[in-house]
C-alpha cells in the first residue's frame, strides 16, 4: 500500500489527491476489519507522508499562501545582488553561478526551465533564448519499483505554451555572459551546469538561493518570486 502511494507521488499527482486516496483506502480497510473480513487494518502501518517531504520529493515548494504572492522590493533586490556576488577575503566567490538568479528575474523563467537551458538554446546576437525542455527531480526506479534516492529527469516543458521564445534585455544577456565565463562546457551542455557539466539538481539550486536570502537578511520567498514580476503584467519589473 505504501508503494501505491509512492507511485502516485512519483507520477506527480497533487498532495491533496494522494491524501484523498490514503483516506479512502483507510476507510475501506477499516470497514473490512469491522466486518471481521480482515483481522487488522493494514493502513495502520502506512503513515501518510508529511506534506513538506511530499512536496520536496516532487521538486515543489511547500510555502505559506502569503509567500506565493511576495515579490522583491527594489531594496531587497539590491541586497540580494550584493550578497549573491559577494566574495571571501581570499577573493573567491561565496556562491556558485549567482547570475542564474538574475537571469530568472529578468526573463520570468521557471526553475526547471532555467536549469534545462542548453547553451545552444541562447542567441545573444538575436537577444533571445528558446525554452525547449524542463528539469526536475524524481524518485529513482528500477523497472516498476521505487528505490532509495532521487535523480534528475529532463523532459517536456510544463505546458505546451511553455515552449517559447523569450527576449533578453541587457541585464539578462549579461547574466548569460557571466554564467558562461564561470562555467562553459560547450553548446550542448546546460547553461547552469554542475561542476561536471551535467544538469544542476533543482534542490541544490534552491538551497543556494535560500542561503543567499538568509545571509542578506531577506525574508524567505520562494524561487517563483524571482519570476513573479514577469508573469504578472501589472507588476513593475526591477531589472538588476
Regions found by a protein language model. Name each.
Residues 1-42, 89-93, 199-203, 219-222:
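N-terminal core-binding DNA-recognition domain of tyrosine site-specific recombinases/integrases
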Residues 1-6, 49-51, 231:
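Short, conserved phosphate-binding/catalytic loop or strand-edge motifs used
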Residues 33-44, 137-141, 178-186:
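Proline-centered turn/helix-capping motifs that create local helix->coil transitions or kinks
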Residues 34, 99-113, 204, 208-211, ...:
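C-terminal catalytic core of tyrosine-transesterase DNA break-rejoin enzymes
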Residues 19, 38, 44-111, 115-117, ...:
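Basic, Lys/Arg- and aromatic-enriched nucleic-acid-binding interface segment
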Residues 87-94, 153-163, 193-200, 217-225:
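Short, contiguous acidic/charged loop-to-helix segments that flank catalytic cores in large enzymes
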Residues 48-51, 117-178:
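Conserved tyrosine-mediated DNA breakage-rejoining catalytic core shared by Y-recombinases
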Amino acid at each position: 500500500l505504501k508503494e501505491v502511494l509512492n507511485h502516485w507521488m512519483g507520477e506527480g499527482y497533487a498532495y491533496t489527491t494522494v491524501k484523498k486516496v490514503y483516506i479512502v483506502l483507510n476507510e475501506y480497510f477499516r470497514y473490512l476489519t469491522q466486518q471481521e473480513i480482515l483481522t487488522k487494518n493494514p493502513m495502520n502501518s502506512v503513515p501518510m507522508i508529511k506534506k513538506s517531504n511530499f512536496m520536496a520529493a516532487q521538486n515543489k515548494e511547500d510555502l505559506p499562501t502569503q509567500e506565493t504572492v511576495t515579490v522583491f522590493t527594489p531594496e531587497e533586490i539590491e541586497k540580494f545582488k550584493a550578497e549573491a556576488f559577494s566574495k571571501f577575503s581570499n577573493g573567491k566567490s561565496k556562491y556558485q553561478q549567482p547570475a542564474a538568479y538574475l537571469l530568472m528575474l529578468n526573463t520570468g523563467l521557471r526553475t526547471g526551465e532555467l536549469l534545462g537551458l542548453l547553451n545552444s538554446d541562447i542567441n545573444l546576437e538575436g537577444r533571445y533564448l528558446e525554452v525547449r525542455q524542463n528539469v526536475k527531480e524524481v524518485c529513482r526506479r528500477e523497472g516498476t519499483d521505487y528505490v532509495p534516492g532521487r535523480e534528475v529527469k529532463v523532459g517536456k516543458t510544463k505546458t505546451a505554451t511553455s515552449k517559447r521564445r523569450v527576449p533578453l534585455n541587457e541585464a539578462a544577456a549579461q547574466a548569460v555572459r557571466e554564467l558562461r565565463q564561470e562555467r562553459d562546457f560547450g553548446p550542448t551542455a546546460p547553461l547552469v551546469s554542475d561542476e561536471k557539466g551535467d544538469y544542476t539538481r533543482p534542490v541544490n539550486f534552491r538551497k543556494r538561493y535560500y542561503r543567499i536570502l538568509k545571509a542578506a537578511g531577506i525574508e524567505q520567498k520562494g524561487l517563483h518570486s524571482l519570476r513573479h514580476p514577469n508573469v504578472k503584467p501589472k507588476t513593475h519589473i526591477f531589472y538588476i
